[in-house]
């Protein structure tokens, strides 16, 4: 487990960019105690995969006449709780391909069969640490894949994807620091004002924007982060990037030499409000997939709600998949349960401002495009938010 964080960050670096963050306020008290995490796991992480409850969700669940089978979705990493909605859709007959890091089976929602098979493919080493969009333009069998707003814009000229639903309303990426060393630091702006070195991977996206906006100075940005915890723990006086849905748990319960949750702020709260891990389709495929998406996107919306309000089923599949993959990535039931609760507490998953789950705000996307241009990041001329997403398939009645 101690090696998994830096390996994940290495994968992100190799996938051509940093995952920029999104919203909700972070603080240094968000990590649960070890006992709480274990108790939550008993309720929502260790249950059998067939623990879901049959429900009548009021949706058209017949995908057999409109969707390809299997419907293939490419993720950006190994199975983890942030991907819960996708694994919620996998039926109890699922199989795990440990060689190719794929979970597949009949598609279901609330115990009801959807009439097709579904295939959830891991990213990272399964696709040579490429971004999902790269794999989608290499392998035509993939129908949808994860994408993140800032990377979506920089890649638009060559590898465009149109986002059709955002399972996460807020990106989990953070900047974190040691609250004992810096008790008066409360925000990313405070980090900048104090002149604290910010240890990142290579510059890209949000660092350029923060420098351009005067939040940080260029000499604060140290792009030498190797993904491991050693320097942050040993030196103590650095700020560092991470994920709110994992790092607080790992630094408190896994990295025993540190033994506490770091303080942090989500990048969203500092103004970098990207959508992370939205599901995108290639523009050339949109019309062909439209009849499928009209039914499938509302089903994903409901799966988001189901996997958060009762995460036992999806967490069990995720943990089973990672164990069966038997790779360098480890993912415990305790972390899965803690992560879901953390996503709830921070608003990483939830409704937008209009009470609808999964839809996207064009103004928020346009603000990222504008910030990228102001920071000197090269984008396709004329690119605007409306080109890159659609809410047309969203069911406005579905939310938490």
Which stretches of residues belong to each language-model region?
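C-terminal motif of bacterial Sec signal peptides marking the signal peptidase cleavage site
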Residues: 19-22
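Short, glycine-/small- and polar/acidic-enriched structural segments
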Residues: 52, 57-225, 238, 242
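Pocket-lining segment of extracytoplasmic ligand-binding domains
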Residues: 150, 225-230, 235-326
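Secondary-structure end/capping motifs
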Residues: 288-375
